[in-house]
């Protein structure tokens, strides 16, 4: 499972225990997310299982699929 740890427009941090110690899966996640030209940068940490995604909100929202993902993230962020 994936938890949405933090969100501000232009920056999303996710966590997944499945990524911890799994370099192959981390590479797959990095490759998939970074394949979208609307994404500025992706950092996947194999030690912590975190994924940091940076993007320009206006550009990202021109892609209908990514706009839906952002809406999902907003609805599922962990409230602290």
What are these regions (language model features)?
Residues 1-22:
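Short glycine-/aliphatic-rich beta-strand segments at the starts of folded cytosolic domains
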Residues 1-2, 14, 29-50, 54:
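Short acidic amphipathic segments
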Residues 5, 16, 36, 65-68:
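Functionally constrained cores in energy, signaling, and assembly domains
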Residues 19, 56-60:
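Helix N-cap motif at beta-to-alpha junctions
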Residues 22-28:
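Ser/Thr-Pro-rich, acidic low-complexity intrinsically disordered regions of eukaryotic RNA-binding
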Residues 59-76:
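Charge-rich, low-aromatic oligomerization/scaffolding segments with amphipathic character
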